[in-house]
Amino acid sequence: MFGMGFFEILVVLVVAIIFLGPEKFPQAVVDVVKFFRAVKKTLNDAKDTLDKEINIEEIKKETLEYQKLFENKVESLKGVKIEELEDAKITAENEIKSIQDLMQDYQRSLETNTIPNHLNEEVSNEEALNKEVSSDESPKEVQLATDNNTKEHDKEKEHV
């Protein structure tokens, strides 16, 4: 304790007994012990407070690092997502346009009574029948198919 050995402590106690006397010595020892306990408690409190402050500072630094990292990641994701969304938007617009073109082709085919072949060539019903006639079917079957197609087309017009 304080760099003092047993012999040195014994010398201090003997001097204290001689100097204070046997009546005041016990009270002086109690006061000295209370003083050292108070000093020890104060030092421990200061140490704990300092440790907490250091820990809080470390946590603050760590939090700021994570915040900066998070902000950097968010910024990089914003750029990527916007580019991807623009690409998706362009693709969707192109698909919508192609669907609208197909719808217009079908609308024109219904109005002009032609069959679209999706190769941007329109084939009339008569040409289609001529192609069918050249196949193995008999003319009677072709005529029945034409009559059925006409009836179905009329029904579709009624629904529209």
Curated annotation (Swiss-Prot):
Residues 128-140, 149-160 have a biased composition (Basic and acidic residues). It comes from the Bacteria. InterPro entries: TatB. One of its GO terms (molecular function) is protein transmembrane transporter activity. Gene3D superfamilies: 1.20.5.3310. The chain crosses the membrane at residues 1-21. This is Sec-independent protein translocase protein TatB. Its main location: membrane. Part of the twin-arginine translocation (Tat) system that transports large folded proteins containing a characteristic twin-arginine motif in their signal peptide across membranes. Together with TatC, TatB is part of a receptor directly interacting with Tat signal peptides. TatB may form an oligomeric binding site that transiently accommodates folded Tat precursor proteins before their translocation. The keyword Lyase does not apply. Residues 118-160 are annotated as: Disordered. One of its GO terms (biological process) is protein transport by the Tat complex. It is a single-pass membrane protein. GO terms for cellular component: TAT protein transport complex.
